Every structure is written in structure tokens, then in C-alpha cells.
Amino acid sequence: MSSGRVSFEFRSFAIHPQDIPLTVLVRCAPKESFFPLVEQVYGNFEAMQVPLQDPAVQKAAEAASSLPPAQRYPALSDALKFTEFFAARGVSVDQAHACLANIATATDVANNAKKYGEAGINQTPTLIINGFQLPSEQSEWPKIAEALRAAGAR
């Protein structure tokens, strides 16, 4: 596999409503920041969910959901403290709001979520090798390596 004969494609999959602004915000940054930001999101995911337990945040998120599309995701991101999280990592508040107001990007993320959901993808991570979806219990590296070798990787 270290020979370069295996290629890896990462596709972000929004399962929950709050995943849409997260996915859009990761795409906001320069390309070279994409994977470092993804790692930051996954590394801090539990902490990022804490605001969801706060009734005031829940109320603000619900209010954001009723806004017009171009205002919805900036307001949701602000309510959930995502804008603040990304600002600390180089995506300014203005840049974040501009990206989140781009309805085409948010719609693309939502459409992909629907398409992947209809294809039976319902969790992250989901690994697909040559069209075959690995069972979730095979998401550890030794099992992935075994599946890659079975698919022809050397």
C-alpha cells in the first residue's frame, strides 16, 4: 500500500443538521488547511457537542432553523459556537459567514447527505473499497489493510 497503488478519497457526510455548517466551514479554508481542520473537528467533536445540551443554545439553533436559507447556517453556526471554533483556527467570522451564506455549498452538502443515506450509508466513518462497503466492525486499520489487500493492493 505504501507503493502508491491505493488512492484515498475523503467525502464528508452530514448525518445531523449541525453537520452541514461544520462541513461547509471545513470547505471554507484554503485546500492545504482542509485535512488539518477535519482532524481538529474530529479531535474536538465531543466538546463541540456540549453546547447542544444548553437550552439557550437549543432555542437559538431552533430559531436559526426558521430563518431564510442565506441566514440559517451562519446563525446556526454562531449558536453552536462553530464560528468561534473555526475563527480560532484561521477562518475569520466574516469568511465563515460568507461561506455559510452560500446556499449552493450548503445545498450540495445536504444533497450528498441524502444521496449517501439512500445508498445505505448511515454512520461515520464508512469505508467503501471498490464499491464494497466494509462493515463498521472492520474500521480499524488491520481490517482495512486486509480488505485493501483482498481488493488487489500490494
Stretches with model-predicted labels:
Residues 1-73, 117:
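Structural alpha/beta surface segment adjacent to cysteine/selenocysteine redox centers
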Residues 70-154:
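C-terminal cap of thioredoxin/glutaredoxin-like
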